[in-house]
Amino acid sequence: ADGSDPAGGEFLAEGGGVR
């Protein structure tokens, strides 16, 4: 949830995170 994946579904506005 820190921005590892731009298409992640945890913090989209933060940069992604966990998918």
UniProtKB/Swiss-Prot annotation:
Transmembrane segments: none
Superkingdom, natural source: Eukaryota
Name this polypeptide is given: Fibrinogen alpha chain
Record keywords, A-Z: Adaptive immunity, Blood coagulation, Coiled coil, Disulfide bond, Hemostasis, Immunity, Innate immunity, Secreted
Principal location listed in the UniProt entry: secreted
Post-translational modification: Conversion of fibrinogen to fibrin is triggered by thrombin, which cleaves fibrinopeptides A and B from alpha and beta chains, and thus exposes the N-terminal polymerization sites responsible for the formation of the soft clot. The soft clot is converted into the hard clot by factor XIIIA which catalyzes the epsilon-(gamma-glutamyl)lysine cross-linking between gamma chains (stronger) and between alpha chains (weaker) of different monomers.
Disulfide bonds: none
Cellular component GO terms, alphabetical: extracellular region
Role this protein plays: Cleaved by the protease thrombin to yield monomers which, together with fibrinogen beta (FGB) and fibrinogen gamma (FGG), polymerize to form an insoluble fibrin matrix. Fibrin has a major function in hemostasis as one of the primary components of blood clots. In addition, functions during the early stages of wound repair to stabilize the lesion and guide cell migration during re-epithelialization. Was originally thought to be essential for platelet aggregation, based on in vitro studies using anticoagulated blood.
Self-association and partners: Heterohexamer; disulfide linked. Contains 2 sets of 3 non-identical chains (alpha, beta and gamma). The 2 heterotrimers are in head to head conformation with the N-termini in a small central domain.
Location in the cell: Secreted
GO biological process, one term: innate immune response
Secreted keyword on record: yes
UniProt comment concerning the protein's domains: A long coiled coil structure formed by 3 polypeptide chains connects the central nodule to the C-terminal domains (distal nodules). The long C-terminal ends of the alpha chains fold back, contributing a fourth strand to the coiled coil structure.
